[in-house]
């Protein structure tokens, strides 16, 4: 379940979906956490709100067609996390109305659709 936090900035309430912080040594670069176990084959739930935090805690404001780098934790708690790249899209599927943003996976030219952190170090 996503955790939403809020704070005041310039007189406006800003809502941020907390991501999963991850030791940068376990990733190749800052990435946004996504659960790769979803109901579709190339779309995954991304966020309920417009701002999400990456693995380093940086706030990322989501926009349509924005390219992002994502990860999911290894299901066996190994340090070799699963990686992917994608494009942010609005959820216009008519399903799961509480989810505003989805990510569409774009295969990486070098590694394919999904790849491991260890692949980036070869």
Across the structure, where does each feature detected by a protein language model lie?
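Short beta-strand-centered aromatic/proline hotspots
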Residues: 79-92
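Short alpha-helix capping/helix-loop boundary micro-motifs
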Residues: 47-58
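Short, charged beta-turn/beta-strand-edge "cap" motif at the junction between a beta-strand
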Residues: 72-78
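Extended boundary segments
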Residues: 2-30, 108-118
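Glycine- and charge-enriched low-complexity intrinsically disordered segments
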Residues: 92-122
């Amino acid at each position: 379940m996503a955790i939403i936090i809020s704070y005041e900035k310039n007189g406006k309430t800003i809502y941020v979906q907390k991501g999963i912080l991850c030791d940068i040594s376990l990733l190749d670069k800052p990435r946004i956490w996504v659960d790769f176990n979803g109901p579709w084959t190339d779309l995954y739930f991304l966020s309920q709100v417009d701002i999400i935090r990456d693995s380093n805690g940086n706030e990322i404001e989501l926009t349509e067609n924005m390219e992002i780098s994502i990860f999911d934790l290894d299901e066996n708690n190994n340090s070799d996390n699963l990686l992917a790249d994608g494009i942010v899209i609005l959820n216009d599927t008519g399903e799961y109305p509480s989810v505003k943003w989805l990510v569409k996976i774009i295969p990486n030219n070098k590694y394919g659709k999904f790849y491991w952190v260890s692949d980036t170090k070869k």
